[in-house]
Design a protein with these regions (language model features):
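AMP-dependent adenylate-forming
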Residues: 3-5, 87, 102-115, 119-146, ...
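Conserved AMP-binding/adenylation subdomain of ANL enzymes
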Residues: 167-196, 204-244
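AMP-binding/adenylate-forming domain of the ANL superfamily
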Residues: 1-156, 171-172, 178, 281-286, ...
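Gly/Ser/Thr-rich phosphate-binding loop
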Residues: 215-218, 243-247, 257-326, 332-335
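Conserved AMP-binding
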Residues: 58-61, 82, 189, 199-203, ...
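Hydrophobic alpha-helical segments in the ANL/AMP-binding
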Residues: 8-10, 62-81, 183-184, 206-218, ...
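Conserved adenylation A10 loop of the ANL superfamily
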Residues: 156-169
């Protein structure tokens, strides 16, 4: 297998009339998804060239998934740009991408124009509702497929950058195919599953949802972001759609607990709960396990740069609040190891010794799009391998081996944090906060116990104005919780 579209094409044959994807407004079968994606790909070839980025400016949904697949048929790669982001953030991402075309919906067009984008804008529905067609479209798509290989990019997801400029992580076909193959096998995801998607499509947790469904013929149910303000709506959607598999951010699971969602109703068909993004509080974990004593619970770890996750731990015992949850063991075909301050290897027979988590293997990202300097810093040659050049990713995360031989997360090497499932550079928050008109100087730290970003600043005492100005430049999850 060389192209993730082979997942879609195989499922369109084996499960043609089965629901492939569903949101709160519409659904589509695997046949419809494949047909509309090919039609979209043919149209997109008129607007851009292969191996170029196409920005998708919309919230997640069936339309979004069709657009993603259409972009891949055109031989390009996609980037989801969240329309709720501040205009400044949108400008930064589009400036890095330098895309020829943005696919959006009419409702988001004004926001896109406000960002200053002056390239081609296409309304998503016209990509497959245009009935004119072209007689040579299939030939053109076939020629494109022959030119694309497994190291060409599929998507570019943006993460926080220490300079205040986001970094676009570029992931290729081979990395996804390698990871998803092991992921679905280990956790027994099959065509019988219904995957309840929580994560936004610019967040790599969603990659597991999308491609696990496409590979196995499972049904993907996309829960709108707005539903999470009303936990009963989330729980009802899980229950009514008979969701079996939840691959969620820790913050979302905790939110549903805090809002007493499971006290209202326990979705009856859930049997797999996989979580990642930050450390799962044992208290919150045990609440979920009390409602689902027979379900599989899995702790996943890994940054965006290694294609979703590099380690996993299937919970096989009870945990008290004094226990530490293991990050676990490496996925097959990924080598996860620790390096000390002098680049010496810290092995499993040195329990308790902390080192930086490093990763080697097929799942490594291609690098940061249009950012060779950041790429060279994070993706380096393995200092332990002197016989030939081996690329590794230095995560900046610290860990140690326990007496049980498992890895345990031990914090960050730098000023990067995980908050609400997102990887954030505190330096970027400080940079934006210091740029607020009434702030002279600022610094931030992350209160891990309360999972809150705390800011100290010199300036005028007007928290409301500070928050309003920051929201114009960064997503809400990057605005400090305490001033």
């Amino acid at each position: 297998m060389e192209n993730v579209l082979e997942y879609l094409e195989a499922s369109a044959v084996s499960f043609s009339d089965k629901i492939a994807a569903k949101d709160d407004k519409e659904s589509c079968t695997y046949r419809e998804l494949a047909t509309d994606a090919r039609r979209a790909g043919g149209i997109l070839t008129n607007y851009t060239e292969i191996r170029k980025p196409v920005a998708v400016f919309m919230e997640k949904g069936v339309v979004t998934l069709k657009t993603f697949m259409g972009i891949l048929y055109a031989g390009c790669f996609y980037t989801l740009v969240d329309p709720t982001f501040p205009v400044d953030r949108i400008q930064q991402i589009l400036s890095i991408l330098q895309t020829d075309v943005v696919v959006t919906l009419d409702e988001y067009k004004d926001k896109l124009l406000e960002s200053g984008y002056s390239g081609q804008i296409i309304c998503a529905e016209m990509l497959w509702n245009d009935q004119t067609g072209e007689p040579n479209q299939e030939n053109r798509l076939e020629k494109i497929r022959q030119k694309i290989n497994d190291t060409d990019p599929v998507y570019c997801n943006f993460t926080s950058g220490s300079t205040g400029i986001p970094k676009g992580v570029l992931i290729c076909h081979r990395s996804i195919i390698d990871f998803i193959g092991h992921f679905t096998d280990i956790f027994h995801i099959t065509s019988e599953d219904v995957i309840g998607n929580q994560a936004p499509f610019d967040f790599d947790v969603s990659v597991k949802d999308i491609y696990s469904a496409l590979k196995t013929g499972a049904t993907l149910v996309m829960i709108p972001r707005s539903f999470f303000m009303f936990p009963n709506a989330v729980v009802d959607m899980l229950d009514e759609n008979k969701v079996t598999t939840m691959i969620w951010a820790v913050s979302a699971l905790c939110l549903l607990n805090r809002l007493h969602g499971l006290k209202y109703k326990v979705p009856a068909h859930v049997n797999k709960i996989l979580f990642s993004g930050e450390m799962m509080p044992i208290k919150q974990l045990n609440i979920w396990r009390s409602y689902y004593p027979d379900a599989m619970f899995v702790n996943l770890y890994g940054p965006t740069e290694i294609t979703c996750n590099c380690t996993y731990y299937i919970l096989d015992r009870t945990f008290t609040e004094d226990d530490r949850l293991p990050a676990g063991i490496a996925f097959p075909n990924e080598r996860v190891f620790l390096l000390g301050e002098e680049d010496q290897e810290i092995s499993a027979d040195m329990p308790g010794t902390t080192g930086e988590i490093c990763v080697a293997g097929t799942a490594l990202a291609l690098g940061y799009y249009n950012n060779p300097q950041a790429t060279r810093k994070a993706f380096t040659w393995n200092p332990l391998q002197t016989g030939y050049p081996e690329m590794i990713y230095r995560t900046g995360d610290l860990a140690f081996y326990g007496e049980d031989g498992l890895l345990y997360f031990a914090g960050r090497k730098d000023f990067q944090i995980k908050h609400m499932g997102h990887r954030i550079e505190l330096e970027e928050i400080e940079s934006v906060l210091s740029g607020v008109s009434i702030v002279e100087h600022a610094c931030c730290f992350f209160d891990e116990k309360r999972s809150k970003i705390v800011a100290f600043y010199v300036g005028e005492d007007d928290k409301k104005q500070i928050v309003e100005e920051m929201k114009q430049k960064v997503p809400e999850y990057m605005v400090p919780n305490i001033f």
